[in-house]
């Protein structure tokens, strides 16, 4: 979590404890990372060899697994998640190929679980689509405090933040979103000014990590 009471003097950061991350980091979960103080993210644990890991995830207190995969989504993974005692939510998200209105339609369910906590949000590569999902959550869900900027971990080259793919998806949503979709997300119309402020904040803070 980042706060900047005086942006002229630089960024001030604080990292809240995350009990789920602390419990899970002992296990071989690829790209495991905390999400705020109430969830974790990482690579999709599909395949028979990961069944034991899904059980460990459940045992630490995870209630819902969020799957961001698109064409590589499988019913078998959903069944494995449910057999391990957790709820499963598929919200296909990527940087450009998924229809933007399909993404918007899935946001209320995604936001509800991210607000509630006790989730594991995953994609095939662990960090790239989870970056995009968390960026959408921050920019299009103003109940998230303005200073609670999520860290973009998957879009870095030689330590430098690359925002192009994230910006492209955020921009595609604000350009396509309809008045009905704004109402569904409980966003004011127009939303352009708040969108611009939050996108700028997201990118500025992530350049400081």
PLM feature segments, named:
Residues 1-120, 132-209:
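Cys-dependent protein tyrosine phosphatase-like superfamily
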Residues 123:
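Short cysteine clusters
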Residues 126:
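Conserved G/P- and acidic residue-centered "switch" motifs that form tight phosphate/ATP-binding loops
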Residues 129:
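Conserved lysine of the Walker
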């Amino acid at each position: 979590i980042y706060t900047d009471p005086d942006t002229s003097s630089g960024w001030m950061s604080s990292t809240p404890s995350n009990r789920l991350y602390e419990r899970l980091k002992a296990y071989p979960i690829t790209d495991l990372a905390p999400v705020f103080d109430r969830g974790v993210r990482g690579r999709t644990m599909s395949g028979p060899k990961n069944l034991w890991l899904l059980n460990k995830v459940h045992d630490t207190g995870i209630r819902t697994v969020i799957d961001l995969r698109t064409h590589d989504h499988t019913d078998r993974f959903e069944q494995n998640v449910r057999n391990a005692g957790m709820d499963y939510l598929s919200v296909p998200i990527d940087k450009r190929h998924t229809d933007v209105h399909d993404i918007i339609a899935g946001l209320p369910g995604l936001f509800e679980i991210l607000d509630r906590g006790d989730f594991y949000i995953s994609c095939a590569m662990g960090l790239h689509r989870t970056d995009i999902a968390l960026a959408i959550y921050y920019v299009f869900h103003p109940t998230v405090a303005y200073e609670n900027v999520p860290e973009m971990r998957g879009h870095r080259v030689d330590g430098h933040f690359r925002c192009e793919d994230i910006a492209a998806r955020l921009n595609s949503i604000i350009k396509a979103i309809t008045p009905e979709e704004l109402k569904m997300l409980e966003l004011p119309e127009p939303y352009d000014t708040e969108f611009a402020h939050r996108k700028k904040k997201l990118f500025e803070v992530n350049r400081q990590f």
